[in-house]
Amino acid sequence: MNQGKIVQIIGAIVDVEFPRNNVPKVYNALKIDGTAIILEVQQQLGDGIVRTIALGSTDGLKRNLIATDTGHAITVPVGTGTLGRIMDVLGNPIDEAGPITYTDQWEIHRNAPSYEDQASTTELLETGIKVIDLMCPFAKGGKVGLFGGAGVGKTVNMMELINNIAKAHSGLSVFAGVGERTREGNDFYHEMKDSNVLDKVAMVYGQMNEPPGNRLRVALTGLTMAEYFRDEKDSSGKGKDVLLFIDNIYRYTLAGTEVSALLGRMPSAVGYQPTLAEEMGVLQERITSTANGSITSIQAVYVPADDLTDPSPATTFGHLDSTVTLSRSIAALGIYPAVDPLDSSSRQMDPLIIGEEHYNTTQRVQQTLQKYKDLKDIIAILGMDELSEDDKLSVSRARKIERFFSQPFHVAEVFTGAPGKYVPLKDTIRGFKAIVDGEYDHLPEQAFYMVGNIEEVIEKANKMTA
């Protein structure tokens, strides 16, 4: 048994001295005698001293306490026993529902699947949210980022996606709450419980009030549980299709920044850790699909000060298949979900994947919206009357499209009083195609606001004129 003693404690950082010929490896977990605290080795400083980060509060620790090297990285329970349970970063239950019965324990630091093991798919994942399905469709087994500043609706959009996809999806889901509000974690738990899909969801939380070590590692804990479901073959010899929700990737980066500063590394641009790209890559490269099973991940990404060029969101962009950008200016118009249709993108936007009709409709919608955007300055200075008849028509259609992008959410029913709407992709394409074709030029634009499919628009317009 390899034992050392604590020689220094600075906040969440603990230095431990071991015999020089028996120094623990980086990422090894150390247990401190008489406590439940786990330390993770981050650096080897020489002379047998290792610098570690504490996963938990360091209150009550003192020098000369004995720390034992476990000989491996942090392990967490995996398997069906984790479903319906809320766990912390170490896989300990925090829902007061008794111990977790697990089939196996896996280390949270793992290699990404090799290049030949990876598989790609072109199958679309329908979300029932019009603006997403039309402008930035998701791929099954792909990675999606929800980008947005403070208070534009990332978590509400995430909850609606969980509501629409996880409930319809017969597979399993893992939710990793990384540095977010405890209230949101609680809301999510009750949302799943009320909709009877709790037994298909594993929840891992490292919330805002926890030390940086917990927030940094909780995303890896959730990912490890998802990887087990993907890789573990069932009776048919196949793994499962798993949904992985991470809220919020920015807090993962921020926890890394805190740890990096505590470890004494020189900060890089905007104060971020110099290892930002590598840390992001280590997490994102593991979120992938293999021939065995798939992981479809939906990640919320906070954008500091609404600046998409900030190093944290900018580093995340390169790893994603679809990006959904939420805009404060669209939220200010009262259009929810506040997705910016011209700033959101998807690698699936190819006529060979989504079909000619969908592709052409999307292109025409984008052209109409772009034309309206270009004309906004002229309208602001000279007014609508100075526009040509063609331009007036384009502006009218663009405003209808903008309003038709809004829709009532199931998860927002309690606030709005309007029942949520799930719109199938074929109805979405049909509706927007009809608008750009000019079939509804005679209807008032208010009729397009906060409805589901195009039939509801006609019904609403009839009520308004009645």
UniProtKB/Swiss-Prot annotation:
Q: Which SUPFAM superfamilies match?
A: C-terminal domain of alpha and beta subunits of F1 ATP synthase, N-terminal domain of alpha and beta subunits of F1 ATP synthase, P-loop containing nucleoside triphosphate hydrolases
Query: How would you classify this enzyme at the top EC level?
Result: translocase
Q: Which residues of the sequence carry a binding annotation for ATP?
A: 148-155
The answer to whether the entry has keyword Cytoplasm is no
Q: Where in the cell is it found?
A: Cell inner membrane
Q: Which GO terms describe its cellular component?
A: plasma membrane; proton-transporting ATP synthase complex
Cite the entry's keywords alphabetically: ATP synthesis, ATP-binding, Cell inner membrane, Cell membrane, CF(1), Hydrogen ion transport, Ion transport, Membrane, Nucleotide-binding, Translocase, Transport
EC number from the UniProt entry: 7.1.2.2
- GO molecular function terms here? ATP binding; ATP hydrolysis activity; proton-transporting ATP synthase activity, rotational mechanism
First-listed, main subcellular location of the protein, grouped into a coarse class = membrane
- Any Pfam family from its record, for instance, is ATP-synt_ab
What role is this protein assigned? Produces ATP from ADP in the presence of a proton gradient across the membrane. The catalytic sites are hosted primarily by the beta subunits.
Protein family (similarity comment): Belongs to the ATPase alpha/beta chains family.
Put simply, this protein is called: ATP synthase subunit beta
Q: Which organism is it from?
A: Xylella fastidiosa (strain Temecula1 / ATCC 700964)
Q: What is the lineage of its organism?
A: Bacteria, Pseudomonadati, Pseudomonadota, Gammaproteobacteria, Lysobacterales
